[in-house]
Amino acid sequence: MKAYQESVNKYGSSTTLPKQAATGRFYTKKIDGRWWLVDPEGCLHLERSATSLRKGTSSRNKTAWNSKFGTDEKWLSTTQRELSEIGFHGTGAFCTGTYSLIQTHNASNPSSPLTLAPSFAFLSQFKSAKSYNYPGGSDDNAAGLVFYNGWTEWCELYLAGSAFADYLRDPNVLGFFSDNEINFSSNSSRILDRFLAISNSSDPAYVAAKAFMDSKGTQSVTDDLNNEFAGIVAEKYYKAVKEAVKKVDDKLLYLGTRLHGTPKYMEGVVRAAGKYCDVISINYYSRWSPELTTAIADWANWADKPFLVSEFYTKGVEDSDLNNQSGAGYSVPTQNERAYAYQHFTLGLLEAKNCIGWHWFKYQDDDGTDNSSKPANKGLYDNSYQLFPYLSFFARELNFNAYDLIQYFDK
């Protein structure tokens, strides 16, 4: 552990790799064909964090929290230390109720911060602010709201308002996610088909889809046309957010919308994200290994921007007291296999020159009534706030050697 701690700074960034310009903020840079994050001190940074850092709500969560911590500062100080001792140095999406506590911790402990990557829900917030309904009455069509009156102007107001005020110009904020898993299409439902099926012919989403088809001179939706239209929708979404960001804090990294499922394989969507996002975030499930020669190569070609794995995990089913009936992560027999899967998957990510890191989903296991009473073994921590020993050991071995492994892969 000492060797690792001496080779990284407070952000977990390398102090031995060539230093870059220090701007006081995180930014991205491509060096010799590999994408990097550069931290506020100018050190090259590989992102390794955990999502959903928040207090558990079950009775045993509360009992354990009170026994082990008792105060927010002890909780976060202990958590920061324990995570950094296994090579995790920050937080990701869904830290509901904790972001302000993390910032308070960071202000009191400037030498041992937890980075933040707060997540928002722009589309649903826009819908509520404007008292709109979802296009066609379905939240599957939420992306169609970008065609509704006021989208661009609302993004500017939202980013300039109270929701973002605490994060602007904070050096410990890696960046932000504007939404989660927007349904630009799925295996069973193409966005162009959905919009064309809206019964209200004056609905702006329907109007946009109809105009697109008219411009193509056809009434038959194909996968290629759907991909092109999805890209148009995505570009209208991302452009509004990015232009609003530039007006309030042009150094705040825009981490995209955590593409998942079908959208992450759609050229039109990824190209649009690459045009306006600083980092393309990917919730990476349904694969045991990163798709180095296919999807990951495509992302590099389509976007010319780095990607961040914003979610991945496996759950152990034989040695967990949870029913494990929820979640997109693969099931494995035990905690041992969770550990092996972590190393296997992240080794593949280290090999990818367009990957700038990952966020494990998530900080702590589900419990109690989580996920409609279908809790699952997703956490680095169990429900008593104890790190899973085998998973944390194997994660530490990989995380501590990550910078050396990158140099090995880049030879």
For each predicted feature, which ranges?
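Short, acidic/polar
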Residues: 72-83, 156-162, 262-273, 291-293, ...
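Glycoside hydrolase catalytic-domain groove-lining segments
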Residues: 218, 228-243, 247-327, 347
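Aromatic-rich peripheral "rim/lid" segments of glycoside hydrolase catalytic domains that contact
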Residues: 193-202, 361-411
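Active-site-adjacent substrate/metal-binding segments within catalytic domains
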Residues: 1-110, 125-175, 220, 224-232
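Polysaccharide-binding and catalytic clefts of secreted carbohydrate-active enzymes
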Residues: 40, 139-146, 166-268
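Active-site clefts of carbohydrate-active enzymes
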Residues: 128-144, 221-223, 261, 266-267, ...
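Loop/turn elements at helix/coil->beta-strand transitions in domains of secreted/extracellular proteins
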Residues: 33-34, 43, 84-93, 109-117, ...
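Substrate-binding cleft of secreted/luminal carbohydrate-active enzymes
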Residues: 92, 173-175, 180, 310-312, ...
